[in-house]
Design a protein with these regions (language model features):
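Glycine-rich, aromatic-flanked loop segments that form ligand/cofactor-binding clefts
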Residues: 7-26, 66-73, 97-149
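An acidic-aromatic substrate-binding cleft motif
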Residues: 13-68, 72, 77
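Active-site-adjacent "subsite" loops/lids of carbohydrate-active enzymes
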Residues: 34-36, 43-47, 114-178
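Acidic-and-aromatic substrate-binding clefts and catalytic sites of carbohydrate-active enzymes
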Residues: 46-50, 94-98, 124
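Short amphipathic alpha-helices and their capping/turn segments at secondary-structure boundaries
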Residues: 51-67, 103-111, 166-179
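Soluble or luminal CAZymes and related metallo-dependent hydrolases
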Residues: 53, 96, 100, 160-165
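Surface-exposed, active-site-proximal loop segments in enzymatic domains
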Residues: 79-93
């Protein structure tokens, strides 16, 4: 591959392939020209976020060019219950966030990022109140609530379920000024 003719070296071939990739393969549509860079804290807290540990994480990631900082699952967990079994009520944990989620949102902004929060809005875990107390909001088949691996699913055709989720999700996004879900 050391032929001296123009265009016949391995370097030249690699350069041409790279130019092709830059022009055609990497060309994103207009809607994808600016996609935000976000940090999701899940792999640092493993579903046990708290205001205290988020402060430490913010200190470590601020100034790194991140646009959003997302608080993942567990922000609503009740003492002694795994987050996956308690989701659906979405009431912030006073134990983990004694100053409230608004204080976390403020701290994220002070670190130069926009706050985001995780919701899994389609289902409820068996330890949540909505799971057992609001079966009317869940999907039914043949008169029975559909349950899969201990999870129940909100009936998105039910106006009461939509109202419940709007209150829980949209209400908290607005209340605590979260910009990403």
């Amino acid at each position: 591959c050391s032929d001296e003719r123009a265009g016949s070296t391995v370097d030249y071939a690699c350069q041409r392939l790279t130019q092709y990739a830059q022009k055609y393969v990497n060309a994103a549509p207009e809607s994808e020209q600016h996609l935000p860079i976000l940090f999701n804290e899940y792999c640092t807290t493993w579903g046990l976020p708290s205001h205290e540990n988020i402060k430490g994480i913010l200190e470590a990631v601020k100034g790194k060019g991140l646009e959003y900082f997302v608080v993942d699952c567990g922000w609503f967990v009740e003492e002694g219950v795994h987050w996956s079994r308690s989701m659906g009520d979405y009431v912030p944990s006073d134990r983990l966030f004694p100053e409230g989620l608004g204080a976390v949102s403020d701290d994220i902004r002070k670190a130069g990022m926009k706050p985001g929060i995780w919701f899994e809005i389609d289902n409820a875990g068996p330890k949540s109140h909505v799971y057992s107390e609001r079966e009317d909001l869940m999907l039914h088949r043949d008169g029975k609530v559909l349950t899969t691996k201990e999870r129940r699913f909100f009936d998105m055709n039910n106006p009461d379920a939509i109202a419940y989720l709007t209150d829980k999700v949209i209400g908290q996004l607005r209340k605590y000024d979260f910009e990403y879900m």
